[in-house]
């Protein structure tokens, strides 16, 4: 049995990480802090964006406590002793003056059974002043900073209009790690015109940064995005389910086994999705990844030194 799992998975599951660290069931509560994104200044933001990553975050019309309690009330019916992490998910959650950040974060930290915060942001939206505050937060609670990279290749970053290059991302991660702040990185498989080798190179690069966790996504083309326009114009290749599973299993084999796998596929809404339609069946994808790892007699980190 693979060491970092409780349910026969062949990779380091988030459930295992939380259970061993906190000895409790832990839920991340997605929150919408009504933030914006600096990349909207560059036009329409990232070409895959539906104007506010975090489509399943709370209702921004509700205050943060209301958003949080709505989820907690449901969860505690089945798990009355659960603990919670406030997940600032929608848009760029450090893109505001420091006093506003403090007010939003501290409001959630004061709530009962909250053991930490997870803050989704961008490498170009964390000032030195903000870094100092995040370091302080990390000493008081379990803090995770989630950064979108998507790809290590500057050519791709420019194509998808990320608004930053690899150097900026690299410098940001190193600053966070120097302050002992947990870092989780988002990557996307199947970005336009990327080869399998390019996707695997991104994972090898992240190994070298000694990140704490990763979220692996499959590129999905959503309605009313710039990506939809590019897809209609170029008909770039969309990974098949079989191709995606093969790439993910290779990535798991390359990733250091201590890196926690926070996500291994996406779950876009059926109404907004154009391609790939196979992504709708999330649990089929997860099961097929498990089957392929078993078929390979493999596990996370098996080829980490390759």
Locate predicted features.
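Active-site-proximal loop/turn and secondary-structure-junction residues that shape catalytic pockets
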Residues: 35, 90-94, 123-125, 149-153, ...
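Short amphipathic alpha-helices and their capping/turn segments at secondary-structure boundaries
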Residues: 72-75, 126-140, 171, 200-210, ...
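Core AdoMet radical
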Residues: 52-71, 75-98, 113-126, 142-168, ...
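Auxiliary Fe-S-binding modules of radical SAM enzymes
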Residues: 2-16, 20-27, 213, 221-306
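Acidic (Asp/Glu)-rich catalytic clusters
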Residues: 75-79, 105-112, 132-142, 174-178
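Conserved C-terminal portion of the radical SAM core fold
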Residues: 167-226, 242-265
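N-terminal [4Fe-4S]-dependent radical SAM core
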Residues: 1-85
């Amino acid at each position: 049995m693979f060491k970092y799992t409780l349910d026969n998975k062949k990779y380091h599951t988030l459930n295992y990480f939380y259970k061993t660290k906190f000895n409790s069931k832990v839920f991340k509560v997605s929150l919408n802090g009504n933030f914006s994104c600096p990349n909207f200044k560059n036009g329409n933001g990232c070409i895959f964006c539906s104007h506010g990553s975090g489509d399943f975050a709370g209702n921004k019309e509700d205050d943060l406590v209301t958003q949080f309690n709505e989820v907690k009330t449901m969860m505690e019916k089945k798990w009355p002793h659960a603990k919670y992490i406030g997940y600032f998910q929608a848009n760029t959650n450090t893109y505001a003056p420091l006093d506003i950040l403090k007010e939003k974060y501290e409001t959630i930290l004061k709530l009962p059974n909250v053991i930490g915060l997870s803050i989704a942001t961008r490498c170009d939206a964390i000032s030195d002043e903000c870094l100092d505050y995040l370091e302080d937060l990390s000493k008081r609670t379990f803090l995770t900073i989630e950064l979108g990279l998507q790809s290590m290749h500057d050519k791709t970053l420019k194509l998808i209009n990320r608004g930053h290059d690899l150097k900026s991302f690299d410098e940001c991660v190193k600053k966070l790690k120097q302050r002992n702040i947990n870092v989780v990185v988002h990557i996307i498989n199947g970005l336009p015109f990327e080869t399998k080798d390019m996707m695997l190179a991104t994972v090898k690069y992240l190994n070298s940064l000694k990140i704490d966790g990763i979220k692996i996504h499959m590129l999905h083309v959503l309605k009313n995005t710039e990506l939809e326009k590019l897809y209609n114009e170029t008909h770039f290749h969309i990974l098949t389910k079989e191709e995606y599973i093969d790439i993910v299993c290779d990535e798991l084999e390359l990733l250091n086994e201590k890196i926690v796998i926070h996500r291994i596929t996406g779950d876009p809404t059926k109404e907004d999705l154009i391609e790939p339609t196979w992504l709708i069946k999330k649990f089929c994808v997860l099961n097929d990844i498990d089957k392929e790892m078993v078929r390979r007699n493999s596990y996370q980190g098996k080829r980490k030194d390759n």
